[in-house]
């Protein structure tokens, strides 16, 4: 018997003793609550008795109350739910450390996070993933990781800081709190990956087969896949997988029929839940394999809106029963991930408990993790120490400053037809357009009247110095530029602007900071944010400080630059995501995702 098994046996014996020996009592009783039973999908009056970290029983707990028992009388007015689980998210998208993300998310009822660190994996490889895994051990909530099997997502179409393959799996799958492989993006574009880079499929299957052999899960990533392509993706993932890139009811229905779990994404800029939930509200499908997830949330939204309570409330507003909606962030994800100790209120489970006053709006009053009160009335009541990352995961920006000329898109004549990425608000899918823009001095110029602006990606790891150039429509800028070292998923420096000069200044400010965000106008830096950890995360600001900083940068892009989309940095970052159709941009150029090809920006 190993040490963990021995410890579990001792704990279970102690719980049995407390229940059977009238001299022993609970440490905590939530009395007269309205218990949300996610197993039977019902609500009924009951007490919840807790001993140390574990639930003793759900029912009449009068006999378990002693002089030392903490009794919280909920007066028959408050609902008692299992703690919420975010099943797919990236700390890097929030620009926060795990500790600071937890500080913002725990008060809204989120007690478990399953994060995919493929952003820092792209930037730094195993070194970055291990550093993040180490932080999971010091926070009060439960944080698990699902690691990338491949970086970059599309070898040959983009440059990452480190190339992860199956050779890395025996190491990174055994880091602390790693429970599987994250989204299988390398086989998202199944048809063209099979046609042009079949070796990727071989390597991915080697990784997923190994992962399954040691009891790990594998997340899928199958945007717009149907039929044979979807079946091939599912088999490559190991026959049991999820997908968080489902954007239509039809996709959701087919994936559920294939036995997949569908993570209904509802984040800061990508909102697909309302489409996915139609599989239940219109088609009457069983919801046991539907799961709520955020994928990407900015600190400002976390501080303002909440976290998984906000997701649940939005699901309810689509016509789903509140208990069924809560199942989608408790028992459903716990079942998928094999997290048998959380997700339900039942004897022997961890006492991760949320007390709710308003079931429709998901107003959270108290949060317990492991039987300990950690948050009340929207505020943490326990301290989460600030976490500082080691120097080895900093200084990831190794490129040289750029000139305006290096970002220019060359063209001939007085006008040019340019291929233009069409931004779609609140989606990471894009459209593909062609516009005619003026040419001056052999350079294709921005056309603000058509909202057609130059966009570029600068390789930042010092591996090849490449720069990709194209045009984009949808930001509405009237002046200036903004750049960042966050650009999914290879995370090179991406920039958009109304002049090449301001674009170069923004890029160079990001380089100077060693990673971050910069907003400029008329040759002047208006605001910036340093992201020293992998060029993705700050360990210098707490969650509330970062929230205020991001809000100010958002204000600058709107007021000073004229940007018309909310969360502009997140929207910009996804224009480099080569696994999501139609056109994207990387350091290698303009990418036609559907044909797996680099295409010239000027027709």
From Swiss-Prot:
Gene3D superfamilies attached to this UniProt entry: Metal-dependent hydrolases, Urease, subunit C, domain 1
Record InterPro entries: Adenine_deam (IPR006679), Adenine_deam_C (IPR026912), Amidohydro-rel (IPR006680), Metal-dep_hydrolase_composite (IPR011059), Metal_Hydrolase (IPR032466)
Signal peptide from the UniProt entry: none
Any matching Pfam family: Amidohydro_1
Domain of life: Bacteria
GO biological process: adenine catabolic process
Alphabetic keyword roster: Hydrolase, Manganese
Required cofactor(s): Mn(2+)
Catalytic activity: adenine + H2O + H(+) = hypoxanthine + NH4(+)
Class in the EC hierarchy, top level: hydrolase
MF annotations from Gene Ontology: adenine deaminase activity
EC number in record: 3.5.4.2
Entry's family note: Belongs to the metallo-dependent hydrolases superfamily. Adenine deaminase family.
PANTHER family referenced in this protein's UniProt entry, alphabetically: ADENINE DEAMINASE, N-ACETYLGLUCOSAMINE-6-PHOSPHATE DEACETYLASE
Protein name: Adenine deaminase 1
Gene source species: Carboxydothermus hydrogenoformans (strain ATCC BAA-161 / DSM 6008 / Z-2901)
Higher taxonomy: Bacteria, Bacillati, Bacillota, Clostridia, Thermoanaerobacterales
């Amino acid at each position: 018997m190993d040490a963990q098994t021995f410890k579990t046996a001792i704990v279970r014996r102690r719980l049995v003793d407390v229940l059977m020996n009238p001299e022993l009592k609970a440490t905590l009783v939530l009395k007269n609550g309205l218990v949300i039973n996610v197993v039977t999908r019902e609500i009924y009056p009951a007490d919840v008795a807790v001993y140390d970290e574990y639930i003793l029983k759900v029912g009449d707990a009068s006999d378990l109350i002693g002089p030392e028992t903490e009794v919280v009388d909920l007066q028959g007015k408050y609902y008692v739910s299992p703690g919420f689980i975010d099943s797919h998210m990236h700390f890097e998208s929030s620009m926060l450390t795990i500790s600071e993300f937890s500080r913002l998310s725990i008060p809204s009822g989120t007690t478990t996070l399953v994060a995919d660190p493929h952003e820092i994996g792209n930037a730094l490889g195993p070194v970055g993933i291990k550093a993040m895994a180490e932080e999971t051990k010091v926070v009060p909530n439960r944080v698990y990781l699902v690691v990338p099997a491949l970086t970059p997502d599309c070898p040959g179409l983009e440059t990452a800081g480190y190339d992860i393959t199956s050779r890395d799996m025996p190491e990174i799958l055994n880091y602390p709190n790693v429970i599987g492989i994250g989204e299988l993006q390398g086989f998202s574009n199944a048809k063209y990956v099979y046609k042009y880079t079949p070796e990727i499929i071989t390597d991915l299957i080697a990784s997923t087969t190994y992962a399954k052999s040691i009891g790990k899960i594998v997340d899928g990533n199958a945007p717009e896949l149907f039929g044979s392509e979807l079946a091939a993706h599912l088999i490559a993932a190991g026959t049991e997988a999820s997908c968080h890139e489902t954007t239509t009811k039809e996709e959701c229905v087919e994936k559920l029929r294939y036995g997949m779990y569908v993570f209904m994404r509802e984040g800061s800029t990508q909102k697909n839940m309302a489409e996915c939930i139609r599989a239940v509200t219109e088609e009457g499908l069983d919801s046991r394999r539907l799961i709520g997830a955020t994928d990407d949330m900015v600190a400002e939204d976390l501080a303002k809106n909440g976290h998984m309570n906000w997701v649940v409330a939005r699901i309810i507003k689509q016509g789903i029963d509140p208990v069924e909606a809560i199942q989608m962030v408790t028992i459903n994800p716990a079942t998928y991930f094999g997290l048998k100790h959380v997700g339900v209120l039942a004897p022997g489970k961890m006492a991760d408990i949320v007390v709710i006053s308003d079931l429709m709006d998901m107003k959270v009053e108290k949060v317990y993790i492991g039987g300990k009160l950690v948050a009340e009335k929207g505020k943490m009541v326990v301290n989460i120490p600030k976490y500082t990352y080691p120097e080895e995961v900093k200084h990831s920006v190794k490129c040289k400053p750029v000139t305006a000329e290096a970002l220019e898109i060359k063209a001939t004549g007085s006008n040019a037809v340019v291929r233009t990425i069409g931004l779609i608000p609140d989606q990471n899918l894009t459209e593909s357009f062609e516009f005619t823009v003026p040419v001056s001095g052999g350079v294709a110029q921005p056309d603000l009247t058509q909202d057609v602006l130059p966009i570029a990606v600068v390789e930042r790891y010092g591996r090849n110095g490449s720069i990709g150039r194209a045009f984009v429509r949808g930001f509405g800028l009237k002046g200036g530029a903004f750049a960042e070292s966050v650009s999914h998923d290879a995370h090179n420096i991406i920039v958009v602007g109304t002049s090449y000069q301001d674009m170069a200044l923004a890029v160079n400010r990001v380089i100077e900071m060693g990673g971050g965000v910069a907003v400029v106008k008329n040759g002047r830096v208006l605001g910036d944010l340093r992201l020293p950890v992998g060029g993705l995360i700050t360990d210098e600001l707490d969650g509330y400080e970062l929230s205020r900083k991001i809000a100010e940068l958002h204000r600058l892009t709107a007021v000073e630059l004229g940007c018309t989309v909310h969360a502009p940095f997140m929207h910009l970052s996804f224009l480099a995501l080569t696994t999501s159709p139609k056109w994207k941009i990387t350091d290698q150029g303009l990418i036609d995702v559907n044909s797996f090809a680099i295409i010239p920006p000027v027709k």
